[in-house]
């Protein structure tokens, strides 16, 4: 009997330890598998949303006292200086809410009640993809949790909240299969390459558990751009991780930047980055905020001198910019709007644009909407570029990767209201000496760090830049327009390393309007300032070549939905397909 009792005890002991081993193994395996094995072996890989606090709204959608079926989730929330950006994710079959149906909801962090402390209408709602939206809400009082709701469905659960001053916010896989990560918070110096060995890139769902993320080498780091070696498992699972895997940057021995940067892949990623023939000879990229009333003239004019493709990075516009771009696209212009809500990131936006344009554009210019390329010779832009690069290379036996064009700064020219015929005709008085330059670059010539200071990029060692003779090409920069337009520059400057005009910092910068100080107060003599020489070169050419001879209207003054072309042209058939060769007068 004693022997049987001892065996009974030993059996239960062995069973206990066996059961404990099975349970611990299951827990370990289960925790590891969701962040690694499911990713590695191609199973569905989804982000885990963590709520800032546990309240009834964080676990169910609240409509009065009764929860309703979840229609959307707030994937991420970013607190910008003067507004809040919320990224919404819908089920694939769900109907997306309109701006009128959504509300910005502000909940008390300390009060567990689901009753909203405040509700406001969103400033804007943009559809990014078929099942995703970007909602811009006004900043609320401190200490409030911000989410969205609808009048019919109640309040939706809040998503994880991030502060803008420390964040990885965008990520693209380049043609060479490296990952380019765009970050805020490293505070690196302008135009300096930093020691990459002090950092590493991390890929995964939850960066608070470093044992469960993939790590990779940082190849270069400069300003706010980090280039990483992409893990092979990420490249091989491209289709599965496109909207799931996030990327961030970790300081070795320190912390990891919070991240909302989900991997994006270029359409030609992994292919030859230098195709024999690209679709477009000349393209233009810009970053703009509330430039709807000037965008039509800017696009149409540059189309008439030979630009074929436009990339518009919309930096939190709340005017009709999206509608103007849509109308231009419908009229036949190859133009796209890229939502770029990130404040003071013009350098990063231009680098992002250069990556996107690499497979499509032989040359791409980076200019603002108040800047117009003027070709005094009457040639088209691609002809000027071809002449510049062929002449230089025949003598120097080097490759030209960047063309730098001098900028003439125009003043109000005696006007007090926005000119009806457009800026190219209305403003005719400027400063004598050029201010700075802008660049037209060959995307594959850019240094891998993608360093730029808005006006030009750093190039690879086997490429050089050239300065263009102002008799061949200049930029007419309508910098100091009528006060109604000029005062908008006091809102915020878009460049990272440029102080806002309202700040006392760097008051003497060339970016500012001399003599204005830090307050948007119109000087009595504003309309006559910055006028040292009369220059009607571009005005004359625009009126001669682009005005309708019947009514003298310019293309951007009409409501036509057809693509504009010069009124005076020479036409000839060059192949079986009817083609036209235009020559400006």
State what each model feature region is:
Residues 286-300, 316:
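Active-site beta-to-alpha loop of glycosyltransferases that engages the nucleotide-sugar donor
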Residues 269-285, 320-366, 374-380:
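Active-site-proximal specificity loops/subdomain of glycosyltransferases
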Residues 1-135, 139:
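Long, charged/polar, low-complexity intrinsically disordered N-terminal extensions
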Residues 300-308:
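Short, acidic, metal-binding catalytic loop of nucleotide-sugar glycosyltransferases
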Residues 2-44, 128-136, 141-166, 172, ...:
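Catalytic-site signature of metal-activated, phosphate-bearing donor transferases
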Residues 87-95, 182-191, 233:
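Short amphipathic, basic-aromatic surface patches that mediate peripheral association
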Residues 308-316, 338-339:
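Short beta-strand/loop segment that forms part of the nucleotide-sugar
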